[in-house]
Amino acid sequence: SSAASDVYKRQIKLKEFRSYHPDFISVTYGAGGSTRENTHELASYIQNDLGIEAMAHLTCVSHTRLEIETLLEQFHQSGIENLMALRGDPPSGKNHFQRPSRGFAYAVELIESIRALNGFCIGAAGYPEGHVENPDKEADLKHQKAKVDVGAELLVSQFFLVNEFFLKWRDRLHRGGVRIPII
């Protein structure tokens, strides 16, 4: 099948990463523009077959809390210890994110739930220029600190072009008491 062929091609490409000795490889949710199953499959391949730490992304989009718990158990059973907990973008065709029925509205809720299960290392998104949906930058910083307070162990910065934005954001987080790695 075409999907199996695509996964195989990705695995061949991923083998090339070993020579760079990365600390970890981040695997987006719905890896390769497909379903969430590829995230688990590729993260497991990276972790178990290549021997490189994998950080699997997990989002709140379209999941109940029970579905999230099932996904967490699958990651745990596969030896995946590192997760990037994200709210996620609105589903295709939607302008705004809406809490799924019996699901999570915010990444902080997802992080808190993950922290209660299986001892995962949890990464969270950081926004040097502020989150696009929150014009209040101070409130935005408080939201990022809240992720740390409930269990995030590192912040992974969103893309930025001006280093000054990142450095000021990092310094404001430090002044606010955030003492975890910021990548």
Named regions from a protein language model:
Residues 2-8:
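Short, small-residue-biased leader/transition segments that mark boundaries at the very start
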Residues 22-40, 90-102, 153-169:
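Glycine-rich, proline-tolerant flexible connector loops at the mouths of alpha/beta enzymes
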Residues 60-74, 101-105:
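Glycine-rich anion/phosphate-binding loops
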Residues 36-56, 102-124, 167-183:
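Alpha-helix-loop-beta-strand connector modules within alpha/beta enzyme cores
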